[in-house]
Amino acid sequence: MDNVGCEASSSRDPKGKKAVGFSPKLRVDKDCARWGNENVEEQTIGTQPTWRNHQHQTSRIRGFICATIIFVVCLGALSYIYRVDVSTTMLSTNQMNESHTAQCKNPPTRREWRGLTTGEKQEFTRSVNCLSRVPSKWGLNGTLYDDFSALHGGIGSWSHRSSSFLPWHRNALYVWEAALREHCGFNGQIPYWDWTMDWMNLANSSIWDSTEGFGGDGEVGGPITVGEGRCVVDGPFTDLRPIKYNHTYVQHCLSRGFRDNGTLGHMSGLPFRPEIIGEVRRKETFVDFEAAVEMHLHNAMHLAISGDFLALTAANDPIFYVHHAQMDHLWWQWQQENRERRLFEYNGKHMHNSTGHDASLDSMLVYGGFTEDIPVSEVMDTEKGKLCYRY
């Protein structure tokens, strides 16, 4: 599957490195500075395109990718700095490791958001807000919640458009859940949002409920904030004040801007209809499955929600975690359908700028000193080892 947008080329190759987040010196292609009107080739599954071939949307996609490449260049340098003293900055997951690594006999089940009780939903949102009051581990002028957004926007960006997209985010979710437990006393499991249940009317999903959900769209008629969005004014996260948007330090309200191309307040559910999900799950190889999940399902939702979700700092929005848990859920289901062959199937391009198909189970997932770097092999089976969960 062809990548859409600009590429960043490396002026030196990482010798012997297979690490997501390795930060070589970059040069940005001069064409990346242009926001052309060329049509993007449609990415299709089934009989209808997942994304509409529209010049306005093309411009937004290209602009989004160009801006984030500049952000990655800056964060690349920081990724080295963050590794200098990991003894004082590394986020601990020891509590979970001690309880789960030695034996994982009864892995708990991650449930769909609507399967949680009212009390469990409130406990989850309380813990998320709590994390936004814990001081930054990286010494940023923000909180631990902001650290996770910076982690994804910098180191995590190297996993996009590559085979490491699914395993890198799987472990990042685990680390985030561990932080909720350690710092905020969270005693549940990360839920997932099964958007296939809402495909006929995504904008009115119960996930956006102001009482038992994540709050809804940005304020109708309110001022534009970031990512063509507006401030979220209902729900449990109205007090969140992220400190960055992509490469820019700008404290702002949590912002969303539901849209279906030029139609505001609406979100197209076509990419998430059941027959599309069925086709994705029938992909025979890991490489094809990963590409379908990321380039279709993942990207389509980021564009539909917009606001904070339009940038690589999308983890500013708590919906990021239940969205990515759903993609992890789909991967888990795909693995279970043929455990003998798929449980440890991992190949393709390990990093988005890899020059060849270098991915292996020994390839490292790197987190820039935020938490321990681990080989891909440690996150392939969620029901054994340190992860210890199922869906």
Curated annotation (Swiss-Prot):
Disulfide bonds: none annotated. It comes from the Eukaryota. Residues 1-21 are annotated as: Disordered. Its EC number is 1.14.18.-. Keywords: Copper, Glycoprotein, Membrane, Metal-binding, Monooxygenase, Oxidoreductase, Transmembrane, Transmembrane helix. Cu cation B binds at residues 298, 324. PANTHER family: TYROSINASE COPPER-BINDING DOMAIN-CONTAINING PROTEIN (PTHR11474:SF127), TYROSINASE FAMILY MEMBER (PTHR11474). Belongs to the tyrosinase family. This is Tyrosinase-like protein phomQ2.
